[in-house]
């Protein structure tokens, strides 16, 4: 009996140290977000890439990646017209012969890096090809990078690009 109690005490004492799921060296803060749908991916945006990941700060940049898919009795949740005044948009895109759906598990901030964690579910297709986007919006902040974590694995880290207006202003005029 004493041996069993001693073993139980050891397991209870050591388990928090020995079985940590993922060591976190940075403090992370949960970030509120909203998901959006009803958009198609432009066939001019990275058309041959199997996956794409973007962080967008303005409507012009968004419009280069996505278009609105209109249908009758449309109930899609789209971005509001003035979204980019207060929000930024993050998107992950999967292309290929599978319909991919997403479930966001969390969005957190670690210093100036946003971390978007989500899971995917794929339904293969014999003939049709798809470009399936995950689109979320969140409040603007002092962020410089976004890390995309898909199904528990770090997939990609991207920098926030300058807005389309800033790019146009920076380009030399002939």
Predicted segments with their positions:
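Positively charged n-region of N-terminal signal peptides that target proteins for export
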Residues: 1-4
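Bacterial N-terminal signal peptides
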Residues: 7-15
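Exposed, flexible binding/inhibitory loops of compact, secreted disulfide-stabilized domains
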Residues: 19-174
